[in-house]
Amino acid sequence: MKKLIPVNPVLALAIVLLAFSNATRSQGPPRAADTLHYPEEKNFRNIRQLTFGGDNAEAYWSYDSKHIVFQRTSMKDGIPCDQIYVGKLPETPGEPFTYKRISSGKGRTTCAFFTKDNKHIVYGSTHLGGDECPPIPDRSKYGNRYIWPIYASYDIFMADLDGNIKKQLTNTPGYDAEATLSPDGKKMLFTSTRDGDLDLYCMDMKSEKVKRITTQLGYDGGAWFSNDGKKIIWRASRPKTEAEVKEYKELLAEGLVAPTNMEVWVANADGSDAKQITQLGQANWAPNFMPDGRVIFCSNHEYKRGFPFNMYTMNADGSNIVKISRDKGFDAFPMFSPDGKKIIFCSNRNNGGTRDTNIFVADWVE
């Protein structure tokens, strides 16, 4: 059986780079002991691991902070590509983390987010395009470059917590995914190829009217609202040279993208006054606003070899970058609880030397 790998761009990129690292140092010293909490991680307290095994990613809080929604792949558990799960967060140290699948088990899913009533989620799914996991592109046909697919069969759906799909929110040709909601739950940001490029759009959840809010050539995705709903933050590629533009357009025409060069952008919620706030090179990913208006994001910019990925904080203008996580593989997808007291993220830490990515929650301290 052909092994399927996760098609979450930054997670898959990390796996590729770590596999290369493991191969090149196979004759080197033994791997260091697993670590749940590194001494340098001064902002984390009472860190707890919620999942154990598989690839668990994009874990995001409900508005009442009682549950999280996330996507999960686990070959050993018969989950060959990402499906969506909801779990109740433990209230005491001895309470286990329990979760259940709420996507259909058909196709591939991605990027789930709770609605304001805490009774529904929105997520992207390819299930209308077929029951099987859509195929992974053969990188050898593209010079072994790191690429990932933009499945045209992705649309965004709303489901209740029993998995019943209540509404299809997008129904246009091409990719529609990467949805997040505003703090008041009235607006939905998402990425779409409906106008020929990978751009950001905003949907009014009541009228379902959609407005395009980015227009520059390049991949715009992973967008979030600020805590007051007035700003948005996202990561974007901006091909500039003739060769870069040619490569980007050729890959996009085949439903592919090479997400290895991304920077963090901010704008007003309507897309106006857009500004690039990082100039770091490599992959700067998963940006989100902190409770005090600063920014937290994931990056591999410190490492020429492309890994590890760690989390950093910075001011909203890109100044004062501070490294806050220290795993030797992968730390990403940070989100603060609505009350700002806790942080949830995904990491390769404490995985017994495997490539598993798990979910962690911690108290946040300054």
Can you say where each PLM-predicted feature lies in the sequence?
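Hydrophobic beta-strand positions that form the internal "hydrophobic ladder"
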Residues: 68, 121, 188, 232, ...
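Bacterial Sec-dependent N-terminal signal peptides
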Residues: 1-28
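Residue-level detector of Asp-centered blade-edge/turn motifs that repeat once per structural unit
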Residues: 63-64, 116-117, 183-184, 227-228, ...
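Multi-bladed beta-propeller domains
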Residues: 32-55, 87-108, 160-175, 203-219, ...
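Beta-hairpin (beta-strand-turn-beta-strand) motif
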Residues: 89, 105-107, 115-118, 124-129, ...
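A flexible loop/linker signature enriched in serine peptidases of the S9 family
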Residues: 52-55, 71-84, 104-109, 124-155, ...
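Beta-strand-rich domains and repeat architectures in extracellular enzymes and scaffolds
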Residues: 35-37, 46-79
